[in-house]
Amino acid sequence: QTCALPISRFHGACEGGLCAHSLNVYRVLHGTFFTPDEDSEETFAICALLHDLCKANFYKKGTRNVKNEATGQWEKVPSYSVEDMFPYGHGEKSVFLIERFMKLKVEEAVAIRWHMGGFDDAVRGGSFALSGAFEKYPLAVKLHIADLEATYLLEQRGE
């Protein structure tokens, strides 16, 4: 999935982008880390496919002005912006939304909560809970790695 808008600097900020990203994360998570006798197919699917549920209805279509290099004229081009209608965090928002419809296992909730790893606002603010989560729940590390690989190695990002 390539998000064709040149100004979609947020990964997955295009029609179908969230679904495509979630499927990529699932493919990486399952293909790289799944061990049939130890892991649950359902848990891997839930974590990979729903980790970014917080981004549903998160991007708003709009336009912005960009100067045309050839003509020197300003032109309106399609763009996406963030419109966070429910400012509840990122991973924690996904967990909250999922649990309105289904009960997560602790391992699933922790993996989804901390899938952003060191990019999470709580970590950047000085929280040390991430290291405890990664030590106690290996699935959290695996989901984070799968998300990174999908985002930076499989998917193309706009400028």
Describe the predicted segments one by one.
Residues F10-G12, G16, A20, R27, ...:
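Divalent metal-dependent catalytic cores for phosphoryl transfer on phosphate-bearing substrates
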Residues T2-L5:
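Short, small-residue-biased leader/transition segments that mark boundaries at the very start
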